[in-house]
Amino acid sequence: MRLARSGAALVLACAGSAAVAVDVSQLDYGCERGAQVAAIYISDTDPALAILQIEGRQVVFQNVPSGSGARYAEDPAREIGYIWWTKGDEAFLTWHAEDGQETDLLRDCRITPTE
């Protein structure tokens, strides 16, 4: 996997409509316990999106307000499910349950250099 394709254009074509160019970048993270996470960021949308492969499925996150860094929520309206936080070259993943419990799933994630 490549570290970043900043400025790359992804062309989405829908039947019966014009193609749309979207700014897409991919960053690979190395986390605690040797976990690897590939995150795809789509910044031209409102809200911006992040897509991660978690527990065998693709999860789409929407950018939500944060005090510092970038915060992406799986279910931004209810603030439950997966939450992906990034700041600089660091990131972490948490789970927010309906009862308000918050569980850290991945900590100490850092962007990994390309080989």
Annotate each language-model stretch with its function.
Residues 22-115:
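Cysteine-centric segments in proteins
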Residues 14-18:
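N-terminal signal peptide c-region/cleavage motif recognized by signal peptidases
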Residues 1-8:
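Bacterial N-terminal signal peptides that target proteins for export
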Residues 1, 21-22:
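Absolute protein N-terminus
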